[in-house]
Amino acid sequence: ALFLSNRDLQIGRGEPVQDTARVLSRYLDGIMIRTYEQKEVEDLANYGSIPIINGLTDFCHPCQVLADLMTIREKFAVLEGLKMCYIGDGNNMANSLIVGGLKTGMKVSIATPADYRPDAEVMAFAEPNPNFFITDDPMKAAENADVVITDTWASMGQEAEKDCLLYT
């Protein structure tokens, strides 16, 4: 394993991601990246020749959700048919929980303020599914839930809104 921070790479200092992806592909067998922008992960995957694992972006947090789903399965022995409730803003965790939960046959219930809904593309995937429910009422969302998940009050990119979010 090799850890490289943004200080170790030239991406933020003008080097095109295409060049970085090609060079890293010569040295490594795979990359797990935690970054802010989803596009950075997609660009690495497009220009590199090795597997890219999304460790975290502003759009999704798939590794965390895989770990959460594994933990739920360890506790209940199954995922299909369980009701999972998420209470929080429609952030990367909400996006990943919606997709992961629905793809494993879970009922997914989300409570989030109207101004902080999940990504439109994720909503377009989820809304036709009868196992998906979204509301701004946490009590309705949590009703009969087997699992309730929450997240940080202020997500990546919302640092300026943190105080406001804590008091609404």
Feature names for model-found ranges:
Residues 1-73:
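Phosphate/diphosphate ligand-binding glycine-rich loop within oxidoreductases
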Residues 2-6, 53-55, 88, 110-112, ...:
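Short beta-strands and strand-loop turn motifs
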Residues 17, 45-48, 67-69, 98-102, ...:
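Short, glycine/charged-enriched secondary-structure capping and boundary segments
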Residues 33, 149-150:
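Redox-cofactor binding/interface segments in oxidoreductases and associated redox assembly factors
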Residues 39-40, 155-158, 162:
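Short glycine-rich, flexible loops that bind phosphorylated cofactors or substrates
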Residues 75-78:
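Glycine-rich helix-loop-beta junction characteristic of Rossmann-like nucleotide cofactor-binding loops
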Residues 80-144, 149:
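Glycine-rich phosphate/diphosphate-binding loop of Rossmann-like nucleotide-binding domains
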Residues 167-168:
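Conserved small/polar residues in nucleotide/adenosyl-binding loops
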